[in-house]
C-alpha cells in the first residue's frame, strides 16, 4: 500500500512538473513572442527600454523627468507636499532649467511616483526645443516637427494624457542633421 501511494504521488508530481514547469511557461512565452514580440522582449530601443526613464547628459538631448537621486531605486522620495526639502529641490531644479534656457514645466521639475517614468508631456518637450536645436546647430522648426511627430495620444484614445517618450525622441534626434 505504501509503494502504491508513493508511486501515485510521484506520477502526479511528474505530471504537474511537466505541465506547470515546462508546458505552461513555454506556451505563454511562445504566445507572448508571437503576439507581442517587442513587449515580450522589454520594449527595447537602440539605447535602452522605452518603458524605463533614463537620464540624458548634455543640452543636445531632450531631458526626461528627474529621478529621485538614486537611479537604481524605483520609487518617489516620500517627501510630503509641505516639505521644505521638497520645495527647495523643486526650486533648484527649476533654476537649473532656467539657466539652460528651458522654461520649467511640472514634469521637468517633479520626479514621477515610480522614479522611472519614460515619458514627458508635449509641453515639456516643446519647452526644450530651442535649447536642443541650438546645441545641435539644427533649425528650431525641424526639432519642433520631430517633437510633434513623437507625441503619442492617450492610450485607446481616452486613457491618460498625450505624452512623448524621451528615449524614442532622442533616438530619432540622432538621425536629424
Task: Report each predicted region and the residues it spans.
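Cytosolic-side transmembrane helix boundary signature
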Residues: 1-7
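Extracytoplasmic/periplasmic C-terminal soluble domains
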Residues: 134-135, 139-177
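Basic, gly/Ser/Thr/Pro-rich low-complexity segments located predominantly at protein N termini
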Residues: 14, 58, 162-165
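Hydrophobic membrane-insertion alpha-helices, especially the h-region
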Residues: 9-27
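Short, well-ordered alpha-helical packing segments
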Residues: 7, 31-32, 170
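Flexible, solvent-exposed loop/hinge segments and secondary-structure transition points
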Residues: 21, 26-28, 32-128, 135, ...
Amino acid at each position: 500500500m505504501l509503494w502504491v501511494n508513493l508511486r501515485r504521488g510521484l506520477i502526479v508530481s511528474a505530471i504537474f512538473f511537466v505541465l506547470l514547469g515546462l508546458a505552461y511557461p513555454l506556451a505563454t512565452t511562445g504566445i507572448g513572442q508571437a503576439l507581442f514580440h517587442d513587449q515580450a522582449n522589454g520594449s527595447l530601443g537602440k539605447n535602452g527600454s522605452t518603458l524605463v526613464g533614463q537620464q540624458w547628459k548634455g543640452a543636445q538631448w531632450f531631458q526626461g523627468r528627474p529621478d529621485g537621486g538614486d537611479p537604481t531605486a524605483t520609487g518617489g522620495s516620500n517627501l510630503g507636499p509641505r516639505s521644505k526639502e521638497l520645495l527647495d529641490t523643486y526650486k533648484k531644479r527649476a533654476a537649473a532649467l532656467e539657466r539652460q534656457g528651458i522654461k520649467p514645466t511640472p514634469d521637468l521639475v517633479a520626479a514621477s511616483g515610480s522614479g522611472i517614468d519614460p515619458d514627458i508631456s508635449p509641453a515639456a518637450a516643446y519647452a526644450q526645443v530651442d535649447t536642443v536645436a541650438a546645441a545641435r546647430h539644427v533649425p528650431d522648426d525641424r526639432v519642433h516637427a520631430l517633437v510633434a511627430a513623437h507625441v503619442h495620444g492617450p492610450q485607446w484614445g481616452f486613457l491618460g494624457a498625450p505624452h512623448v517618450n524621451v528615449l524614442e525622441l532622442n533616438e530619432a534626434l540622432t538621425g536629424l542633421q
